[in-house]
Amino acid sequence: MRHRTMRPKTLWWIGCWAFWVGTAWSGPQREEHLADAVRITMSSAVADLPPPTPYLPTSSDDQAYQQWLAHTQAQLAKKLQDKRGQWRLPELATPDLQQAFLQTVWYESHRAGLEPALVLGVIEVESGFRKFAVSSAGALGVMQVMPFWTRQLAHGDASVLFQWQANMRFGCVILRHYLALEQGGLHMALGRYNGSRGQLAYPQAVLAAKRRWQP
């Protein structure tokens, strides 16, 4: 289905971001007709963004989460530093920012029934963790969400996709939707997410990254 034309103001604003932050690897997610029940379910899933505070009912759950957070933050910090020890991305240049980012990953992935390692793999391949990434196809943010999703599921303001939590909320809900369409087939669902269904390069890259993020 052909994408609708975005408003000139939105295109100008996104173009400015593209100039400053460069492009990311993302094919065009296909805009599709959603059955009313699916659209309502997905719209409900992306609505209401409470603080991404983990629900940890037992002390063992809390301990497992703290171990995951410490281990993953150490991995992330190592990945984000260059050979001189300088931070590559200002939006993730402090331990507090890294922790907030990972807390959001944990919350949004579990909320959608996805593994945090899978979501981190998608983020690494799609945007290289760049909060303001813009692909040549027009996908935005860390999970490279196409702007038409904000129109189909929410208020139509694509600028929210440059916010960590909103971007991950959309990205995780969309990936869960594609998994349902593909009856749990992860390779095909990832292909749909990237706009390259049936091709191997993208799913293999994400799954390789996923393995690196597993505890």
Language model: regions and residue ranges:
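Extracytoplasmic/secreted proteins, especially bacterial periplasmic and envelope-associated proteins
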Residues: 71, 75, 100, 104-107, ...
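Outer-membrane beta-barrel translocator domains and adjoining extracellular loop/strand segments
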Residues: 135-136, 203
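Catalytic and substrate-binding regions of cell-wall glycan-acting enzymes that process beta-1,4-linked
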Residues: 142, 147-151, 181-215
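A short, structured beta-strand-centered segment in the mid-to-C-terminal lobe
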Residues: 158-167
